[in-house]
Curated annotation (Swiss-Prot):
Homooctamer; tetramer of dimers. It comes from Methanococcus aeolicus (strain ATCC BAA-1280 / DSM 17508 / OCM 812 / Nankai-3). Belongs to the THI4 family. GO terms for biological process: thiamine biosynthetic process; thiamine diphosphate biosynthetic process; thiazole biosynthetic process. This is Thiamine thiazole synthase. Involved in the biosynthesis of the thiazole moiety of thiamine. Catalyzes the conversion of NAD and glycine to adenosine diphosphate 5-(2-hydroxyethyl)-4-methylthiazole-2-carboxylate (ADT), an adenylated thiazole intermediate, using free sulfide as a source of sulfur. NAD(+) binds at S43, E62, R63, G70, V134, H160, I161, D162, S180, M227. It holds the Pfam family Thi4. The keyword Metal-binding applies. Keywords: Iron, Metal-binding, NAD, Thiamine biosynthesis, Transferase.
Amino acid sequence: MDISKIDLKADEKAVTKSIFKATYEMWMDNLEVDVVIVGGGPSGLTAGRYLADAGVKVLILERHLSFGGGTWGGGMGCPYITVQSPADEILSEVGIKLEEGEDGLFVADSVEVPAKLGTGAIDAGAKVLTGIVVEDVILKEGKVSGVVINSYAINKAGLHIDPLTINAKYVIDATGHDASVACTLARKNEDLGLVIPGEKSLWADEGENGLLKYTKELFPGLFVCGMASNATHGGYRMGAVFGGMYISGKIVADMILEKLKNE
C-alpha cells in the first residue's frame, strides 16, 4: 500500500444515505424470523450459533453495545473464566484456546471467549443487533409470537416513545440473572399464573447442573436458557464457571430445532 497516493473520499450525504439504506434493508429482512434470542451473553451466543448453523433464521438482540454478557471481566476483574468438560468442546469449535486448570477445569481468556463466540454466531449466519432492548413480548392466542423492541438509549433516557415489534416462531430469554423477558410476561399477564422466584445464592455444582435441568420451554413460544433458566426456577448462581451456560445454549438450540423439524 502506497500511502502517498491515497486520497480518501467521504461525502457526508453518501455516508448518511449508505447507512440509512443498509439499515432499512436489514430491518426489512429481520421483521419476521424463526427465532429471536434476547441477550447476547454466553448461552445466547451459543444457541444462536447452533441454530444459525442449522439454517434457522436467528436474530440476537443485545441491549448493550457489545455482546458477551459478563464474560469480559472474568472473575472479579481477573481476565480468565473456567469451564468443564464437555463444554470445552463448544469453545474449541470456534477456536478458543484452553489451558488446564484445577480439579478438571479448563481456563480460557475472558476477552477471547466472547469475541470468538460472537463472531462464530455471526459467521454461522445469525444477525446480532446491539443497543436494542426488549421491553415486552407479542402474546397472541396463548403463545409468545415475537418481541416488542425499542432503542436502549431511548429507554435509558426515559423518553415516552412507542416501540416496534419483531415476529418470531420462538423467543429465547437469554437475559441472564434478571430473566427480564420471562419476568415481564409474568408481571403483565397475571392470569397466566407464571411465578418467577428468582435465583438463589451461590452453589457452583448445583447452579451448573440446574442450568441443564431448567433449560426448557417456560411458556408456549418462550424458552429460557443460561442464568435466566435458573432465575425462573429458583436455581443457584455459580460464579465464574461457565460450562453450564454454553451447554444450556446448545440444549435450547436442540430443543427448538426439534420443534421446527416437527412443524
